[in-house]
């Protein structure tokens, strides 16, 4: 069984009720943080997961709303890990990830120096291990595998999605993307697909062109549902709602998705959990 927790379902616009885009996937004793939107560690703490308890951080792409809290994750995982010789924290992302991680650690350079000077048991900077992928196997440990495939969020490139499998169950995390063959293939037959969604029918009515621009590189609710249908997934889990879902509007979003997908549809707020079991 895999467990999905929507840690943050918000957008780049700060929302008092929604953290930035981030999803936690738990597979037995392993915990994977997919993207690091603002507020993610507080949301993770609410479900009993600390930064030092993460098995790996998976980044779908390097847009600011998806990596806003990366620095906090890196530093907090370091200062709250009390093992004598802690293993490096794996960061898995697209090309460019190593550069972003290096720059993030440099930005926190003074803080890192202060802590090393103050604590006798902190003698080196945060141990980080970066792996960059555009496609193929990315993880195989203790019965959990992760595979990567390219997505389409152009002009943001490259961007990737992840397929996590354990004990016969599978979850695909699409990240930000328009429909594309590579995502269909990655998600084929998966038990669950976590997909970011926007309401293009609403966004196109907003007067500012900069806001309307997001329509050409994100999937609408119906497009995400159509991807789920083509791929033959069991459950569609929607997240990263743009605009934010208002109180009592969840069924509107679910009904839109149901026009394209007849399977289980999950629409949830932050901390919404979905258990994923292998389909028989």
Swiss-Prot record:
UniProt EC number: 3.1.26.11
Which InterPro entries does the UniProt entry name for this protein?
AtsA-like_MBL-fold, Metallo-B-lactamas, RibonucZ/Hydroxyglut_hydro, RNase_Z/BN
Residues noted as binding Zn(2+) 2 in the record, renumbered to the chain: 65-66, 176, 240
Question: GO MF annotations for this entry?
Answer: 3'-tRNA processing endoribonuclease activity; metal ion binding
Can you quote the record's cofactor note?
Answer: Binds 2 Zn(2+) ions.
Q: Which cofactor does it need?
A: Zn(2+)
Q: What class of enzyme is it?
A: hydrolase
> Where does the chain cross the membrane?
none
Pfam families linked to this entry: Lactamase_B_2 (PF12706)
Q: Which reaction does it catalyse?
A: Endonucleolytic cleavage of RNA, removing extra 3' nucleotides from tRNA precursor, generating 3' termini of tRNAs. A 3'-hydroxy group is left at the tRNA terminus and a 5'-phosphoryl group is left at the trailer molecule
Catalytic residues of the enzyme: 65
Q: Which residues bind Zn(2+) 1?
A: 61, 63, 153, 176
Keyword terms: Endonuclease, Hydrolase, Metal-binding, Nuclease, tRNA processing, Zinc
Q: Which family does it belong to?
A: Belongs to the RNase Z family.
Subunit composition and interactions? Homodimer.
> Which PANTHER family does the record match to this protein?
ZINC PHOSPHODIESTERASE ELAC PROTEIN 1
* The protein's role, per its UniProt record: Zinc phosphodiesterase, which displays some tRNA 3'-processing endonuclease activity. Probably involved in tRNA maturation, by removing a 3'-trailer from precursor tRNA.
Indicate what this protein is called per its UniProt record.
Answer: Ribonuclease Z
- Origin organism is Mycobacterium bovis (strain BCG / Pasteur 1173P2)
Give the classification, highest ranks. Bacteria, Bacillati, Actinomycetota, Actinomycetes, Mycobacteriales
């Amino acid at each position: 069984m895999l467990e999905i927790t929507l840690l943050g379902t918000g957008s780049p616009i700060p929302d008092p009720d929604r953290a930035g885009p981030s999803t936690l996937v738990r597979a037995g004793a392993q915990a994977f943080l997919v993207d690091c939107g603002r507020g993610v560690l507080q949301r993770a703490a609410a479900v009993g997961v600390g930064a030092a308890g993460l098995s790996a951080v998976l980044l779908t792409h390097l847009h600011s709303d998806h990596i806003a809290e990366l620095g906090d994750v890196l530093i907090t995982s370091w200062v709250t890990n009390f093992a004598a010789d802690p293993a490096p924290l794996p960061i898995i992302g697209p090309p460019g990830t190593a550069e972003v991680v290096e720059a993030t650690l440099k930005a926190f350079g003074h803080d890192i120096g202060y802590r090393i000077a103050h604590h006798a048991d902190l003698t080196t900077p945060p141990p980080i291990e970066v792996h960059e992928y555009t496609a193929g196997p990315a993880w195989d440990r203790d019965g959990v595998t992760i595979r990567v495939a390219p997505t389409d969020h152009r002009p943001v490139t490259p961007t990737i999605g992840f397929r996590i499998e354990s004990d016969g169950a599978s979850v695909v995390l699409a990240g930000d993307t328009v429909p594309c063959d590579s995502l269909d293939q990655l998600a084929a037959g998966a038990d669950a697909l976590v997909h970011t969604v926007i309401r293009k029918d609403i966004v196109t009515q907003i007067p500012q062109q900069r806001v309307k621009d997001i329509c050409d590189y994100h999937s609408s609710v119906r497009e995400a549902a159509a991807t789920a249908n083509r791929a033959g997934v069991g459950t569609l889990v929607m997240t990263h709602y743009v605009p934010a879902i208002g109180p009592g509007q969840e069924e509107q979003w679910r009904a839109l998705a149901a026009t394209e997908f007849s399977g289980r549809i999950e629409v949830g707020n932050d901390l919404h959990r979905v258990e994923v079991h292998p389909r028989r």
